[in-house]
Amino acid sequence: MVKLHPGKEDLREGWMDSDNEMARRAGWSLTTERVINRPDGLDLDGLLTRLESSMSREVATVQWTMNYCLAEIGINFAEHRSRAIAIGEALGLFRDYPVSKGCTSPFAPIWIAEMVRRQS
């Protein structure tokens, strides 16, 4: 429902800095949606810096949505791909996440490489 709200950009920015874990998660979810669908004017370098500096300190539920954002930046923007992969490697989040046969790991470097491979 929020994704259709005309003021979602203000909500996105505010929620990313919220004290509430679920609001931060929603903020990162809206950010990922923007990365995928409307990246014009979005500071991708700034987002990568923020992900790199704060993702490891977040609670698991927020890390999951931040990781999704990191992966989508790496998948959709070749000029940011190596940095997104390097951040994923350095943080190591979801490196050992159990994955069913035939599924793609949520570990950002693996996820990015696989999605880029599928797109080519």
Question: Each predicted region: which residue ranges?
Answer:
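Alpha-helical scaffold domains
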Residues: 1-120
